Amino acid sequence: MSTDFILAVDQGTTSSRAIIFDKKGNIRKIAQKEFTQIYPKSGWVEHDAMEIWGTQSGVMREALEFGRVKPDQIAAIGITNQRETVVVWDKETGDPVYNAIVWQCRRTSSICDEIKRDPQFVKYIKENTGLVVDAYFSGTKVKWILDNVEGAREKANAGKLLMGTIDTWLIWNLTRGKVHATDYSNASRTMLFNINSLEWDKKILDYLNIPESMLPEVKNSSEVFGVTDSHTLGGAEIPIAGVAGDQHAALFGHCCFEKGMAKNTYGTGCFALMNVGDKPVYSDEGLLTTIAWAENGKPTYALEGSVFIAGAVIQWIRDGLGLVRSAEDSEYYATKIDSTNGVYLVPAFVGLGTPYWDMYARGTIVGITRDTKREHIIRAALEAIAYQAKDVLECMKEDTGLDLAGLRVDGGAVQNNFLMQFQSDILQSEISKPKINEITGLGAVFLAGLAVGFWKDKQELKSILTTEKVFEPQKDSQAVAHDYRGWKKAVERSKAWAECYS
């Protein structure tokens, strides 16, 4: 039987998904299942690792069944996953010793504070992992499990425990324990991996007291990791051939293969990544340096910036203020007026991310007069999403010296044509919206397909990624500069608010 399809395993923070793609990039079937979010204490977030595996294997079988695709028609599997979330499990039984600690979890802040008392070590971590010291990343989460779960430290020292990010956990289960591996992109998000020497960093491992025997083998993002166990998917041994963290997979799915190409994902927040080529670029502007993907032992690096509140500000004007009935209504109201009339909304509801990194900033609306109507507030909320993206992309230009070679976009908010046009105006750059919505899954199958010869090269991938709409700047640069100065002034008003008035 011919292998006509590739299966994307898309394991996210709130749901497990499986997507079957054909050779033209068309989607044959999507299956999705949400799973439990566990909050043991304030600021703590966990997932049941067995539930993750159960839901993920379930949706894979469901996609095959309802897509009417036989397992032996699948040429390869590509995995993309929520990053930084980590699992520690028993090497013999395969049972987790504790729940997966999720990327959002802040329980290891005190460990990070302790590390920060040593500025030289903080500098070492940034220069060698590309990351800042933060509870966000996997390393301190592993230390917490070893220090706090009874018997874990002893078992780890005896070589009886394994650890891995979610991709590693899925690969282990798909192969029934035959393969313990990760890819370069996921490894680069652990705060344990040296992105210069491309190996686990012994100095950091020793500092956190994590035995190297726990760590997975690091492989290329496009490479055959192993095959599914014959009992996993209807008897077929399917190559697992592509692996990348979700944001990295999206960059690859957008075909951002050249230096200076960037993508922005508009979800609850925003994640912007720029391809910076075959050498790491370290940021003076609060960006993270990461490995985008690796092929044939050669990494491609990226700069990453994150915005905490993007689409969530539209949810707020809908649910919190009642200014719109649906997110779609925001475009209608924003286009009823020509401008915000000097109103700016800074959605710093949980502080500000890149490049400000102010956890005490709070949401602010400035420029209100008696003439201000709800349309002005709604438009200001949408414009804030674009301004924040510009903040991040300006930092990338500053750090790299590269001009933005257009911006590829994905996520729910890209359906808002007003927002996309304003984004193009404020960046003075072309914005490309693809026809395919499932860009993250597409990136995973692109990586897998290249590894098994399903697609011959990146040129063929580019022909699959078709553009639905291109937005060109319609506003002159002087007007843009004037509006952006106003945004910067509004941001200054929002800073340190909770510090002063809490």
Curated annotation (Swiss-Prot):
Keyword Kinase part of the UniProt annotation: yes
Binding positions for ATP per the UniProt entry: 13-15, 268, 311, 315, 412
An annotated GO cellular component: cytosol
Record keyword Zinc present: no
Reaction catalysed by this enzyme: glycerol + ATP = sn-glycerol 3-phosphate + ADP + H(+)
GO biological process, alphabetically ordered: glycerol catabolic process; glycerol metabolic process; glycerol-3-phosphate metabolic process
Keyword line: ATP-binding, Glycerol metabolism, Kinase, Nucleotide-binding, Transferase
Binding positions for ADP per the UniProt entry: 13, 17, 268, 311, 412, 416
Taxonomic superkingdom: Bacteria
EC number, UniProt record: 2.7.1.30
Pfam families for this protein: FGGY_C (PF02782), FGGY_N (PF00370)
Means of activity regulation: Inhibited by fructose 1,6-bisphosphate (FBP).
PROSITE patterns reported for this sequence: FGGY_KINASES_1 (PS00933), FGGY_KINASES_2 (PS00445)
InterPro entries on file: ATPase_NBD (IPR043129), Carb_kinase_FGGY (IPR000577), Carb_kinase_FGGY_CS (IPR018483), FGGY_C (IPR018485), FGGY_N (IPR018484), Glycerol_kin (IPR005999)
Pathway, per record: Polyol metabolism; glycerol degradation via glycerol kinase pathway; sn-glycerol 3-phosphate from glycerol: step 1/1
Gene Ontology terms for molecular function: ATP binding; glycerol kinase activity
Amino-acid positions noted as binding sn-glycerol 3-phosphate in the UniProt annotation, renumbered to this chain: 13, 83-84, 136, 246
Binding of glycerol, residues: 83-84, 136, 246-247
HAMAP family per UniProt: Glycerol_kin
UniProt-listed NCBIfam families: glycerol_kin, PRK00047.1
Similarity comment: Belongs to the FGGY kinase family.
Function: Key enzyme in the regulation of glycerol uptake and metabolism. Catalyzes the phosphorylation of glycerol to yield sn-glycerol 3-phosphate.
Name of the protein this chain belongs to: Glycerol kinase
Source taxonomy: Bacteria, Pseudomonadati, Pseudomonadota, Gammaproteobacteria, Thiotrichales
Gene this chain is encoded by: glpK
